[in-house]
Amino acid sequence: MKKIFKKLFAKNRIDLIQQNLKVNNPNILEIGIHRGDFSKQLILKFNPKKLYLVDPWIAYNDFVYKNSWYGNSDKSNQKIQDKYYLDLLKYFEKYIYEKRVEVHRKTSDEFFLTNENIFDLIYIDGNHLFEFVKRDILNSLKFITEDGIIVLDD
């Protein structure tokens, strides 16, 4: 399997992916969904064969997150996280019924333990702590197609 690491630039995430994705109707894995805004763009722009969405939708209140984008906000409230999850299920209801979207309410580590699929695109925007990002990258490398791309967000 050929691995090429490069830093690419585009005016936005969708353009970056369009410039580099070499397959139509890709299998896509998105790690870190939050409210699903980017997930909605992925389904509309790429018409994936299947879109896998992975997020635990858990409110972390640890001091580690206190000064992060995630801490001290609605993102650290479990009721809000539950609402985000339910809203996402409602939005993707048709796609879930058609078996074009799978929503996994679990950590990416838990997802990868039982995953048997390979992906043309893996978009990583999960837990931003170094050890989690590192694991997401290492796990993703095991499940990406030869011409697939892995995109890291912030």
PLM regions with names:
Residues 2-5, 14-154:
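S-adenosylmethionine/decaboxylated-SAM
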